[in-house]
């Protein structure tokens, strides 16, 4: 999505940056993990296919993707984005008849970045961005039956189950943006690339 191609969103523990070509090799490494492929319902791609996908997502106005940087690693590694990459967060506008509904996805791929609240903060910041900049009024999420960490996280944020698919072995959850007032996202929007310490 072009609208976020020069935007960085800085939170307390994370920095969201647009998914750029330089991020592809690390992202591709993550997506070799059978566990991550299963949890994200993804297929293994060749490196060139991953580069093509990154370009496709950049130009697709129905997809908003940010790479999640671990802010502690960012500060410790001299602002090195690649060494600070922790995962990604996405919004997909799948319904052409209702562009106010977005499917949200989160992946914290780096094991050392899990269990520290980075996923929660990434979701809150992305939801805030979706509501304020992209006019989202409802979020949906599709999560595998066996993905307990994600199910727990989304439930804690107030997402509620609307359906369950035995065929796809997943649960679909929803969250109405008028409930977002009960949640907070401490975020600063900066121009990307970031020039100084965040």
Curated annotation (Swiss-Prot):
EC number: 2.3.1.-
Species lineage: Eukaryota, Metazoa, Cnidaria, Anthozoa, Hexacorallia
Pfam families: Acetyltransf_3 (PF13302)
Gene3D superfamilies: 3.40.630.30
UniProt keyword annotation of Ion transport present: no
Species name: Nematostella vectensis
Alphabetically ordered keywords of this record: Acyltransferase, Transferase
Enzyme superclass (EC): transferase
GO molecular function, one term: N-acetyltransferase activity
Protein name: N-acetyltransferase 9-like protein
The organism's place on the tree of life at top rank: Eukaryota
Protein family per UniProt: Belongs to the acetyltransferase family. GNAT subfamily.
Presence of the UniProt keyword Transferase in the record: yes
All copies of domain N-acetyltransferase, residue ranges: 14-186
């Amino acid at each position: 999505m072009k609208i976020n191609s020069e935007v960085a969103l800085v939170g307390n523990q994370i920095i969201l940056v647009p998914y750029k070509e330089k991020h592809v090799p690390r992202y591709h490494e993550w997506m070799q993990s059978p566990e991550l492929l299963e949890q994200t319902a993804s297929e293994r791609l060749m490196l060139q296919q991953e580069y093509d996908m990154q370009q496709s997502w950049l130009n697709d106005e129905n997809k908003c993707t940010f790479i999640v940087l671990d802010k502690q690693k960012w500060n410790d590694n001299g602002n090195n984005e690649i060494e600070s990459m922790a995962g990604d967060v996405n919004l997909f506008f799948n319904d052409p008849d209702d562009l106010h509904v977005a499917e949200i996805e989160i992946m914290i791929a780096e094991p050392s970045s899990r269990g520290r609240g980075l996923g929660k903060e990434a979701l809150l910041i992305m939801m805030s961005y979706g509501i304020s900049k992209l006019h989202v009024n409802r979020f949906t999420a599709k999560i595998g039956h066996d993905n307990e960490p994600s199910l727990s996280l989304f439930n804690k944020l107030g997402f509620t189950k609307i359906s369950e698919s035995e065929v796809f072995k997943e649960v679909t959850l929803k969250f109405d943006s008028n409930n977002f007032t009960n949640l907070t996202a401490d975020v600063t929007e900066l121009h990307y690339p970031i020039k100084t310490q965040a």
